[in-house]
């Protein structure tokens, strides 16, 4: 189901096929198993299809980079660990396993799993002594970026806590890490600044002539991870490190402001700590 997807990955699959010494693809769907084998980018043996009693679905791709194409390959293991960990964070209750083959043909294995996704990840980052409890907000919205555009669906999830020992802000969209944020980052900055400022004003926390707080004051003790999904996405560029959807920014800002207002009312002791 590609309703909420980073893309169809057609170009990536094609590029991998043509830059591999070999590539094997195994697909299970609709009661059948399909196999394709490629060597140096060309299919060998055609498509093989057979019935199967297994009910599982999915695709397995196994390939080896072609050393005639990649004359110098040196990718640190930490890169693969980081990629799989991020995928585990935004895909709760799914196990990701990294197996690294050593020179003696033995394997080193690492498992990445977050039962509650971003909420567990925030708790992990904050450590044993966060300033406040981990909060998790989730919701669905539907709207459009412009009047002449079609409506699209948005899923929003945000987990956060406050800490006087660590800070972290991470944004994900359609399971992809947004290194440069974009719309979700703008929404978080606007909503947290607005609601904390409103709390300080309504509870007379400001000193006379004291300037209103800025997000820079807040982020130094904020641990927050957001994971959003949408059926239509506008990326800042082809690297897909930031999204620019106007509606996502607007609906996420409203979503956060509403939930933060309730959080401050229902948790007065934590609100005082934050202030």
Regions found by a protein language model. Name each.
Residues 4-6, 10, 14-17, 22-275:
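GHKL-family ATPase ATP-binding module
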């Amino acid at each position: 189901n590609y309703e909420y997807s980073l893309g169809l990955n057609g170009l990536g699959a094609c590029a991998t096929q043509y830059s591999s010494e070999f590539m094997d693809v195994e697909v299970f769907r609709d009661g059948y198993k399909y196999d394709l084998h490629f060597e140096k980018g060309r299919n060998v043996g055609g498509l093989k299809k057979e019935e199967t009693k297994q009910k599982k679905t999915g695709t397995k791709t196994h390939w080896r980079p072609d050393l005639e194409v990649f004359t110098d390959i040196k990718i640190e293991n930490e890169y693969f660990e980081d990629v799989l960990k991020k995928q585990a964070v935004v895909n709760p209750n799914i196990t990701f396993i990294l197996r690294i083959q050593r020179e003696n043909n033995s394997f080193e294995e690492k498992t990445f799993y977050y039962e509650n996704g971003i909420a567990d990840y925030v708790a992990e980052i904050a450590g044993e002594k966060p300033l406040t409890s981990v909060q998790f907000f989730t919701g669905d919205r539907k709207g459009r970026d412009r009047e002449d555009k079609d409506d699209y669906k948005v899923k929003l999830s945000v987990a956060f806590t406050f800490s006087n020992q660590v800070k972290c802000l991470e944004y994900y969209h359609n399971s992809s890490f947004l290194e440069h944020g974009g719309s979700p980052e703008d929404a978080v900055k606007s909503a947290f600044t607005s609601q904390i400022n409103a709390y300080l004003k309504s509870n007379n926390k400001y000193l006379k002539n004291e300037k209103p707080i800025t997000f820079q004051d807040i982020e130094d003790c904020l641990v927050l991870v957001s994971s959003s999904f949408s059926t239509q996405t506008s990326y800042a560029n082809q690297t897909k490190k930031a999204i620019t959807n106007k509606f996502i920014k607007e609906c996420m800002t409203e979503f956060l402001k509403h939930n933060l207002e309730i959080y401050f009312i229902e948790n007065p002791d934590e609100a005082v700590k934050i202030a």
